[in-house]
Amino acid sequence: MRSFNFCNNCGKNGHLYQYCNDPITSVGVIAYKKDDKELKYLMICRKDTLGYIDFLRGRYTLNNIEYISSLIDIMTNDEKKLLLIQDFENLWSELWGSNVGIQYRGEESSAKEKFVKLKKGYFIDNIFYNLEKIIKNSISCWIEPEWGFPKGRRNYQEKDLFCGLREWSEETGYDESSINIITNILPYEE
């Protein structure tokens, strides 16, 4: 029997994204221009840090304070402040806007439970931990989120080039017709 499962990660048939054994794949376009014999690359600044997103999504266990601290350490000062002064519903709504897809709705209640417990505080091995204490102990002072090349995940059965152009256009606001594609080069992998 023929399988109609298509993986949005590796682009192969036979399995779905959540069962893919390949590393998570993002596809993008690296745009550059030559200016006075110097190459200049177009990069974008993320709206939110990866640490902030993973923290709000509840992608940690409450007994792993070291990992929670590492998420806090890669957040901006403003993000840390928001965690202390806003409730979960506002933070979640600001993170996703009106684009909360079904894929994130399932983790919202679990993430909220963790957030509320962390804000109130709890004991691990007779030591009290809460969000305020963890943030106070953070030594990082990031002013802005990470910068990177515009990229994202492919849609169902989308080819790499079309995905890269779509993501580039969505994240930069430029029309994809404003660039020339260089062909016959190997893709960049990090």
Language-model features and meaning:
Residues V27-A31:
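Short beta-strand scaffold segments in enzyme catalytic cores
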Residues F4-H15:
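Short Cys/His-rich zinc-binding micro-motifs
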Residues S177, I185-E190:
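Active-site-adjacent beta-strand/loop module that shapes the phosphate/pyrophosphate-binding cleft
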Residues K34-E38:
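Short strand-connecting beta-turns/loops that link adjacent beta-strands
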Residues Y17-N21:
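Cysteine-centered loop/knuckle micro-motif
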Residues L39-R166:
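Conserved Nudix-box catalytic region and its N-terminal flanking loop in Nudix hydrolases
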Residues T172-S178:
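Short secondary-structure junctions
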